[in-house]
Design a protein with these regions (language model features):
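Catalytic cores of alpha/beta
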Residues: 6-16, 58, 62-76
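Histidine/lysine/aspartate-rich catalytic loop segments that bind and position anionic ligands
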Residues: 1-49
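Contiguous, function-dense segments enriched for cysteine-driven chemistry
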Residues: 53, 65, 110-117
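Glycine-rich phosphate-binding active-site loops on the catalytic face of alpha/beta enzymes
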Residues: 20-31, 74-94
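Active-site beta-loop-alpha junctions enriched in small/polar residues
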Residues: 2-6, 26-28, 54-55, 59-65, ...
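Electropositive phosphate-/nucleotide-binding environments in soluble metabolic enzymes
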Residues: 7, 39, 64, 91-95
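C-terminal helical cap(s) of enzyme catalytic domains, especially alpha/beta-barrels
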Residues: 87-113
Length: 117
């Protein structure tokens, strides 16, 4: 279930029996002015999802410049980045695009912020 990163949407997903939610990261990716506040909102939402027993994914607009901070959120289990990877693959090939993204995600998950994974 694709939702906004807030407690009310997560609670509504739980109420209808959803096992997994995907937090919308578009605002974080496209609003450089409000990016820090949006990151805090995503972190809080992911933590709330974990506290109520729902698996948390994230996606929309993620690219090489925005993925690391989202990947470092300990309670996010999966990222959806297909659109960017396919577009980027036009320039460097799909294996290279995936490899670069994987390196960024792996580095973020082993950083102090993502060390709880």
């Amino acid at each position: 279930m694709f939702i906004e990163a807030n407690q009310a949407d997560i609670d509504a997903a739980v109420a209808i029996g959803a096992d997994i939610v995907e937090l919308h990261t578009g605002r974080y990716c496209h609003d450089s002015v409000g990016r820090h506040d949006e990151l805090l909102r995503l972190q809080a939402a992911a933590q709330h999802a974990a506290s109520v027993g729902i698996e948390c994914h994230a996606g929309h607009g993620l690219d090489y410049n925005t993925v690391s901070s989202i990947a470092a959120i300990p309670y996010i289990d999966e990222l959806n980045i297909g659109h960017f990877l396919i577009g980027e693959s036009i320039f460097c090939g799909l294996p290279a695009a995936i490899e670069k993204m994987r390196q960024l995600i792996d580095a973020a998950c082993t950083s102090p912020a993502g060390a709880n994974r």
